[in-house]
Amino acid sequence: MGKGTLYIVSAPSGAGKSSLISAMLEKNPTYAMKVSVSHTTRGMRPGEQDGVHYHFVEKEHFEDLITKGEFLEYAEVFGNYYGTSRVWIENTLDKGIDVFLDIDWQGARQIREQMPHAKSIFILPPSNGELERRLNTRGQDSEAVIAKRMAEAKSEISHYNEYDYVIINDDFDTALMDFKAIIRAERLKQDKQAAKYSGMLDALLAE
């Protein structure tokens, strides 16, 4: 059995990243895929579940994990730590399961430095106007917060050229097909097929 592939997925807020990842998992139940769940020291919000949205841990425990080198990447945001578990990702990949890592461009850089074989996907909105419309439609943020998100989006988008693949999420179904095409193409690469079908290949090449 071959190893799974780590997919780094980045996008500006409102581009549809989370929806595409969720749909990919939901519509392809036979694919061996999981989403990485980050650790955080912030408090649990209403509706959140430990181990589903985040692994909620105490600051002291998080800092102990940092000391032990158990995070692929971590950052402190507004006084709270957020980090990606190295152990969980490596164990999951070793089982032949692909892992999606939803992360920003800065975290993506850290991950690529440590796991250069990871594949990266950047999801773009079709226009700034459409991105702003989607943020407004969600009804979650004030005008000031939306303006801040739009400014952050420009910074995030400027790093699209650091990624292996780019998906334009203009039509959701088309973007989802593009997403699946990337996963399929990666699974059909020679090294993946050789690991998956080693027995068959040995038989085909036997005298």
UniProtKB/Swiss-Prot annotation:
Highest taxon above the source species: Bacteria
Keywords recorded for this protein, A-Z: ATP-binding, Cytoplasm, Kinase, Nucleotide-binding, Transferase
Record SUPFAM superfamilies: P-loop containing nucleoside triphosphate hydrolases
Reactions it catalyzes: GMP + ATP = GDP + ADP
InterPro entries xrefs: GK/Ca_channel_bsu, Guanylate_kin-like_dom, Guanylate_kinase, Guanylate_kinase_CS, P-loop_NTPase
Domain Guanylate kinase-like: 4-184
Localization per Swiss-Prot or TrEMBL: Cytoplasm
Protein family according to the UniProt entry: Belongs to the guanylate kinase family.
Biological role: Essential for recycling GMP and indirectly, cGMP.
Protein name: Guanylate kinase
Organism: Vibrio vulnificus (strain YJ016)
